[in-house]
Amino acid sequence: MTANPLADVVSRQYAKWVYPEPIVDLPGWLAGNWQWFDPSHAHRMFWPDRGYRPDMKILVAGCGTNQAAVFAYTNPHASITAIDVSQPSLDHHRFLKDKYSLRNLELHRLPIEEAGSLGLDFDLVVSTGVLHHLADPDVGARSLAALLRPDGVLAIMLYARYGRIGVEMMQGVFRDLGLGQDETSLGIVKETIASLGADHPLQSYKALAPDLAYDAGLVDTFLHGRDRSYTVDDCLAMVSSAGLVFQEWFLKSGYSPPSTTGSFHAAVASLPQEKQWSVMERINAVSYT
């Protein structure tokens, strides 16, 4: 029998360890940060042949504590629907909605697998760092794809396998130690991470991961109840399984060979595009895809 996504290991985790770190001051946060896939700045990446449409309908699937509120704030004429399995995350969204009068934001406690029950369709569906936590990510991707309008875009962020090798090594260590999602285990995680040598594979990831500065981020990274990572081929297979057409990487530099005269990069550039991406993800070892 399939576990209820509203009461499984992932929803229990996010009920206790609220993630990401809640934003209290949206304008202050936005002064130095940006959200993945926010059409207020990224619309040309999704629709290169048209300008920004302020009245679009957007679904943020797995909104966490802040993401949909950011979208509603930066796209004030858009209609934003947010779903998540974590009630504390939705409660913080409610706080932000009330504080900033985000009347264009609707909140629902709903798993991605049941998103079709909304009875809506969308110009843009965003799922950032969520599908890789589902019991069956392909089912989740198909559920979201079914909500797209004919010219709609599904924007997904997944863990990239090669950039997370250090993380997966440490996850394995902590599983072998029998650690759980409790304060004692978290203390062991902190002590272990602090003891790693400068050449450990985790160090390059740490430099790109501000989440590791607070407890819920450490739990999410090293003690998660369920996650997996993806290669280029895995990503393309998910897109195909969802009945969609792959458009582009959001962060492109990690997948394309530089324009140099070296023989290696010339050899890579001679490959079919999908094979180029596969080769370069192993060269650059990006953490997110």
In which residue ranges do the predicted regions lie?
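Conserved alpha-helix/loop element of class I SAM-dependent methyltransferases that forms part
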Residues: 16, 21-56
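Class I SAM-dependent methyltransferase SAM/SAH-binding core
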Residues: 57-59, 66-114
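A short acidic, Gly/Pro-enriched loop at the edge of an enzyme's catalytic core
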Residues: 116-124
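A short SAM/SAH-binding and catalytic strip from SAM-dependent methyltransferases
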Residues: 123-136
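A short glycine-rich, Lys/Arg-flanked "PGG" loop and its adjoining helix->strand segment in the class I
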Residues: 138-150
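Conserved class I S-adenosyl-L-methionine
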Residues: 153-204
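Short alpha-helix
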Residues: 228-246
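Conserved small/polar residues in nucleotide/adenosyl-binding loops
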Residues: 289
